[in-house]
From Swiss-Prot:
Record-linked SUPFAM superfamilies: P-loop containing nucleoside triphosphate hydrolases
Basic residues bias spans: 1-45
Positions of post-translational Phosphoserine modification: 101, 490, 504, 517, 529
Name of the protein this chain belongs to: Guanine nucleotide-binding protein-like 3
PANTHER family documented for this protein: GTP-BINDING PROTEIN-RELATED, GUANINE NUCLEOTIDE-BINDING PROTEIN-LIKE 3
Predominant cellular place of this UniProt entry's protein: nucleus
Family: Belongs to the TRAFAC class YlqF/YawG GTPase family.
Free-text comment about domains: The basic domain (B) allows nucleolar localization in the absence of GTP. The intermediate domain (I) inhibits nucleolar localization by the B domain and is required for exit from the nucleolus. Exit from the nucleolus to the nucleoplasm requires both the I and the acidic (A) domains, and may be triggered by GTP hydrolysis.
GO MF annotations, alphabetized: GTP binding; mRNA 5'-UTR binding; RNA binding
Alphabetical list of Pfam families matching this protein: GN3L_Grn1, MMR_HSR1
Annotated organism of origin: Homo sapiens (Human)
Modified residues (N6-acetyllysine): 79
Gene name, Swiss-Prot/TrEMBL: GNL3
Tissue specificity annotation: Increased levels in lung tissue in cancer patients.
């Protein structure tokens, strides 16, 4: 019975009832034990595997491994398909009218047909598709936002793309300094002063955990003095809104804003922060956005997400390791991580990772693997795993490092004074400067002593023309599959040869066996007639044909 003014009923009961419950429980357990005893203990049969004496053991094991791998890939693909279907259903349930009214006309206008994309993706090179999508975004946009990582702004700029935007006509280019909470404030201010001489620059810090539009969240009472989570806070959103809104008023028409940049600089996170909803897919892995995506911010401003730039293979090894999503697959992890480590300040790296001084990258990765408990069989340090760990930290959004801006500003060859003035026209730069100052004051960046100094390799060259892209090599999985198939074919040929040899050997053995049997029988008869010590089983009957002397 629930007592008045209390949330829960009392758990007290009479002793008779408690003992009765305990007795029932004991009887139930006794009954279960008795049934288990009757059934007996059946030891599970151990899989004996393929015996060593079995023919074609290696081929059988290889087939079993391939079958297991195919099943795992099929399960993973089914899981991804289910997730996509659930996301589609959730979007339709939450906003059933947004797709036909807003998104479909825009997709038709910008040429975003999913069936065409699927048909092209099966035939054409994926990098060529990225170039096509990037060109579509630049052509369809009135304002282009180039997102830069505040830790290395110069390394996140692509001169080829900027030159294409300048040559395309009346388009505005704005720089966004994202991840500004991962650099010291002094360094952020110096980079802002350097970049704003050339183009309008916005200090930004995207929210990595926006509200999911299809997820129903429970309201939880928050403490009065409790600060919001670091990942939920967004800085610079108001300044960017005012900048785009002011430009739209000067144009007196609806504008389209394209968001471009290298992989993992936070393009989709900026769109989600502006929309305050999970509109674009974001994640730790690089290069998740593979096609342009139209997101209406309001009636007058439409924002377009784009795939990342394609990094030219002629760049330095550190630029390839930090900017290319395929660097860890194409290049060996040790080479990519060593290139990053060579550009970082050794003393600050030692303090950050709490390792002793190192002479080379191999020694550093060995000590790091021991410190992090990354071991292989036999207690050997997993050096490759430590290299992958360092690469993931430096390309992620958690490690604090910074670069110094150049001492003197020199405009690139595709920029001149008239182009700089034209790019800044139509924007309220005074209000932008005030908003940037407020954002810098609000952002809690790391101290200089807690961040790592990095030597930037300068501008990163990209590829925007399809003719400059060479044909892609098959992916690692496809290459492995082809190698396995080739091995399987060669093994089958060798097996057939072995079978032929064995069969011919068997036939030869049969023929020789008959001859040998005749020879041996003759030999046996001769030995029987000449060996006197051997006991010979003969008939006791008297043989009249034999002359006994």
């Amino acid at each position: 019975m629930k007592r008045p003014k209390l949330k829960k009923a009392s758990k007290r009961m009479t002793c008779h009832k408690r003992y009765k419950i305990q007795k029932k429980v004991r009887e139930h357990h006794r009954k279960l034990r008795k049934e288990a005893k009757k059934r007996g203990h059946k030891k599970p049969r151990k899989d004996p595997g393929v015996p060593n004496s079995a023919p074609f053991k290696e081929a059988l094991l290889r087939e079993a491994e391939l079958r297991k791998q195919r099943l795992e890939e099929l399960k993973q693909q089914q899981k991804l398909d289910r997730q996509k279907e659930l996301e589609k259903k959730r979007k339709l349930e939450t906003n059933p009218d947004i797709k036909p009214s807003n998104v479909e006309p825009m997709e038709k206008e910008f040429g975003l047909c999913k069936t065409e994309n699927k048909a092209k993706s099966g035939k054409q090179n994926s990098k060529k598709l990225y170039c096509q999508e990037l060109k579509k975004v630049i052509e369809a946009s009135d304002v282009v936002l180039e997102v830069l990582d505040a830790r290395d702004p110069l390394g996140c700029r692509c001169p080829q793309v900027e030159e294409a935007i300048v040559q395309s006509g009346q388009k505005k280019l704005v720089l966004i300094l994202n991840k500004s909470d991962l650099v010291p404030k002094e360094n952020l201010e110096s980079w802002l002063n350097y970049l704003k001489k050339e183009l309008p620059t916005v200090v930004f810090r995207a929210s990595t955990k926006p509200k999911d539009k299809g997820k129903i969240t429970k309201r939880v009472k928050a403490k009065k003095n409790a600060a919001p989570f670091r990942s939920e806070v967004c800085f610079g959103k108001e300044g960017l809104w005012k900048l785009l809104g002011g430009f739209q008023e000067t144009c007196s028409k609806a504008i389209r804003v394209g968001v471009i940049g290298f992989p993992n600089v936070g393009k989709s996170s900026i769109i989600n922060s502006l929309k305050q909803e999970q509109m674009c897919n974001v994640g730790v892995s690089m290069g998740l956005t593979r096609s342009m995506q139209v997101v209406p911010l309001d009636k007058q401003i439409t924002i377009i997400d784009s795939p990342s730039f394609i990094v030219s293979p002629l760049n330095s090894s550190s630029a390839l390791a930090l900017r290319s999503p395929a660097s860890i697959e194409v290049v060996k992890p040790m080479e990519a991580a060593s290139a990053i480590l060579s550009q970082a300040d050794a003393r600050q790296v030692v303090l950050k990772y709490t390792v002793p001084g190192y002479r080379n990258s191999l020694e550093f990765f060995t000590v790091l693997a021991q410190r992090r408990g990354m071991h292989q069989k036999g207690g050997i340090p997993n050096v490759e795993g430590a290299a992958k760990l360092l690469w993931s930290e430096w390309t992620g959004a958690s490690l604090a490092y910074y670069c110094h801006p150049p001492t003197s500003w020199t405009p690139p060859p595709y920029f001149n004074e008239s182009i700089v003035v034209d790019m800044k026209s139509g924007f309220n730069l005074e209000e932008l400067e005030k908003n940037n100052a407020q954002s810098i004051r609000a952002i809690k960046g790391p101290h200089l002593a807690n961040s790592i100094l990095f030597q930037s390799s300068g501008l990163t060259n990209g590829i925007i023309e399809e003719k400059d892209i060479h044909e892609e090599l098959p992916k690692r999985k496809e290459r492995k599959q082809e190698e396995r198939e080739d091995d399987k074919d060669s093994d089958q040929e060798t097996v057939d040869e072995e079978v032929d040899e064995n069969s011919s050997g068997m036939f030869a053995a049969e023929e020789t066996g008959e001859a040998l049997s005749e020879e041996t029988t003759a030999g046996e008869q001769s030995t029987r007639s000449f060996i006197l010590d051997k006991i010979i089983e003969e008939d006791d009957a008297y043989d009249f044909s034999t002359d006994y002397v």
